[in-house]
């Protein structure tokens, strides 16, 4: 059995087991958490040539703001009164972190503004994926949530890569690159996300 046939079997299993609402939230987790969030944060880091890491990484800390807002809207979870104050303070801190005490402006040759926007998009994507993941765990175990997330993320990323840059760059990756990819997948990838879903139950 080749890899493509295995993916088809897994896909049909997922479609057969879960209803349309569950599949929609699985897709949202894959689209935002697995694809857009990852692409956005990597794009942000490349825009600043891995400098200004403080700005890019600290703006990521705003993702709980988006998660809590969406949890209120989608999951109908109640917000404490103090949330509005701390949420506003976090957004204000994010602004000063990016622009200091200046108004936003685009400086030629400076990618910090674009990188900050990508970082905010990543924060929104990861934050929303937390909410969608919480909804998914009502219908699936944390292990199944991980497997289906990877399955759908692979499908989404396959389409994105096919429609944008193509697959030519795969041939340029060295053995060392693939080893690093595997290490990332097994540690901060699969291992971390499995613990994340375990705690999100």
Task: Annotate each PLM feature.
Residues 64-124:
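Juxtamembrane helix-loop boundary signature in multi-pass membrane transporters
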Residues 1-8, 24, 28, 85-92, ...:
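Hydrophobic alpha-helical transmembrane segments of multi-pass integral membrane proteins
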Residues 44, 73-75, 79, 136, ...:
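Hydrophobic/aromatic residues within transmembrane alpha-helices
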Residues 42-78:
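Specific alpha-helical transmembrane segments that line the substrate/conduction pathway
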Residues 15, 45-49, 98-112, 164-181:
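Membrane-interface helix termini and inter-helical loops of multi-pass transporters
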């Amino acid at each position: 059995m080749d890899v493509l046939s295995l993916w088809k079997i897994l896909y049909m299993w997922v479609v057969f087991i879960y209803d349309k609402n569950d599949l929609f939230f699985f897709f949202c987790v894959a689209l935002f958490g697995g694809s857009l969030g990852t692409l956005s944060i990597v794009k942000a880091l490349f825009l600043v040539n891995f400098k200004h890491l403080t700005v890019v990484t600290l703006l990521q800390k705003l993702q709980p703001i988006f998660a809590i807002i969406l949890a209120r809207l989608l999951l109908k979870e109640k917000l404490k009164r103090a949330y509005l104050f701390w949420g506003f303070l976090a957004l204000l801190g994010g602004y000063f972190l990016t622009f200091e005490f200046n108004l936003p402006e685009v400086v030629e040759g400076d990618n910090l503004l674009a990188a900050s926007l990508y970082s905010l998009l990543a924060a929104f994507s990861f934050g929303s994926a937390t909410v969608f993941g919480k909804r998914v765990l009502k219908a699936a175990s944390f292990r199944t949530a991980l497997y289906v997330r990877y399955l759908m993320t692979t499908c989404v990323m396959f389409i994105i890569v096919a429609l944008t840059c193509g697959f030519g760059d795969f041939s340029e990756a060295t053995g060392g690159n693939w080893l690093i990819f595997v290490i990332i997948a097994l540690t901060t990838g699969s291992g971390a996300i499995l613990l994340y879903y375990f705690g999100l139950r």
